[in-house]
């Protein structure tokens, strides 16, 4: 078992770390304070070929793997979670569905623009009555004269309302009733096989469990009837784009269906697994950033005639943070390697997501505590880290959902 990164992976990590420290960190506090989307940073990420890391070069991607992607996300989250989630949601949720389940025509149309960072992709799953219970989707799409007519609403959607947002992949009920249905058949590259392997380990898996025929449909920005609401006022991730979406008599061509009709539930379960690797990497990155700031401050801050880093109580906090981060990082890497090996990674991805979200919250809290009063001041990064951490136990599946997924995978 080799725990060393390959030269290519080391290069990715070093490149993104230098970019994050040199370009992102200096503006992170201002972007957060102004709630300004990081357009210039996204453009630079595109030029560095980081907006499409795990996709083939033939579609404009970086030709990397899931581990390379996780390393990049971690390094960005180490200095700013808003930039990290922008890349993460774009790659795992916005672009992956098209690559995995799209037709060759859909891939040729969308992937080059998404992988270059020219446009952002989004994934519209969550609804007012369909969060953890994603099978309770109420958005409907009915076929009419060679089109899909969509009506419904989504909420908490990332990347859908920026000036460079290009397309959102939404889940919608495509049956005339709420009875389960759906055609068989192959999706894109390994789509149906991957979805079915994943579905078995999830609560409510399969369209029969959801009780509805759910399909995924691509809706380009600018389509009449598709509107993006005002961005939410959030606790954290203030420089990322998060808003509700509405669809009113929204017409898209029938060929915008992603994969076979009725396979949407299985598809998005697989997409969520992939997304959990990215969000878990964010948790490791935020925790590492909190440790970095805490250690730096502890070595500079003096009390009772010596740096507070010399006090056993502070050393214990730093040691525990470091140890937990090292263990969590290995779990994230294991999930990424399992995915790249073509193995079922549902269990490991859920474990990584559960572990790292909780770890990020604890490390951010400890970092604030070590900073004392300064940890409560916005100019110090740990204050932002503290606000950004909590969502990592909620987004991409709550901790409680991860526990359900893990227990089911264990056969409980």
Task: List each language-model region with its residue ranges.
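Flexible, glycine-rich active-site loops centered on histidine and acidic residues
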Residues: 95-101, 123, 135, 177
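Flexible, small-/acidic-enriched active-site or ligand-binding loops
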Residues: 207, 222-251
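Short Gly/Pro-enriched turn/cap motifs at secondary-structure boundaries
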Residues: 129-132, 158-163, 207-209, 234-241
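Short, surface-exposed charged micro-motifs
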Residues: 138-140
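Fold-independent oxyanion-binding glycine-rich loops
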Residues: 75-76, 102, 125-128, 144-146, ...
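A short, Trp-centered hydrophobic/proline-enriched beta-strand micro-motif
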Residues: 117-125, 170-171
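Alpha-helical interface subdomain recognition
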Residues: 1-79, 83, 89, 101-106, ...
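A short core secondary-structure module
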Residues: 151-227
């Amino acid at each position: 078992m080799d725990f060393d990164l390959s030269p290519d992976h080391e290069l990715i990590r070093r490149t993104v770390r230098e970019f994050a420290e040199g370009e992102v960190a200096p503006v992170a506090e201002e972007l957060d304070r102004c709630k300004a989307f990081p357009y210039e940073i996204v453009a630079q990420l595109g030029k560095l070929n980081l907006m499409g890391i795990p996709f083939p070069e033939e579609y404009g991607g970086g030709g990397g793997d899931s581990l390379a992607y996780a390393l990049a996300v971690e390094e960005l989250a180490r200095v700013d979670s808003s930039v990290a989630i922008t890349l993460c949601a774009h790659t795992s949720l916005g672009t992956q569905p098209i690559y995995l389940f799209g037709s060759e025509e859909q891939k040729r149309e969308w992937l080059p623009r998404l992988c270059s960072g020219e446009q952002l992709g989004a994934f519209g799953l969550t609804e007012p009555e369909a969060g953890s219970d994603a099978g309770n989707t109420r958005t409907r799409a009915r076929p009419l004269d060679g089109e899909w007519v969509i009506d419904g609403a989504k909420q908490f959607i990332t990347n859908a309302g920026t000036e460079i947002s290009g397309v959102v992949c939404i889940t919608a009920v495509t049956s005339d009733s709420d009875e389960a249905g759906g055609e068989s058949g192959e999706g894109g590259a390994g789509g149906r096989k991957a979805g079915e392997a994943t579905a078995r380990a999830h609560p409510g898996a399969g369209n029969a469990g959801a009780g509805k025929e759910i399909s995924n449909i691509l809706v380009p920005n600018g389509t009449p009837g598709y509107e993006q609401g005002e961005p939410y006022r959030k606790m954290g991730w203030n420089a990322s784009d998060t808003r509700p979406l509405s669809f009113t008599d929204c017409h898209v061509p029938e060929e915008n269906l992603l994969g076979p009709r009725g396979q949407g539930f299985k598809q998005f379960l697989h997409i969520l697994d992939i997304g959990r690797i990215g969000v878990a990497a964010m948790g490791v990155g935020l925790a590492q950033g909190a440790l970095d700031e805490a250690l730096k401050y502890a070595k500079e801050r003096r009390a009772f005639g010596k740096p507070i880093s010399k006090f056993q109580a502070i050393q214990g906090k730093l040691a525990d943070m470091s140890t937990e981060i090292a263990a969590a990082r290995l779990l994230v890497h294991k999930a990424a390697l399992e995915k790249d090996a073509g193995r079922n990674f549902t269990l490991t991805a859920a474990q990584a997501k559960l572990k790292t979200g909780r770890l990020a919250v604890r490390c951010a809290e400890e970092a604030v505590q070590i900073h004392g009063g300064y940890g409560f001041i916005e100019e110090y990064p740990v204050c932002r880290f503290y606000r950004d951490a909590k969502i990592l136990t909620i987004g991409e599946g709550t901790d409680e959902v991860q526990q359900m997924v893990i227990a089911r995978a264990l056969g409980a």
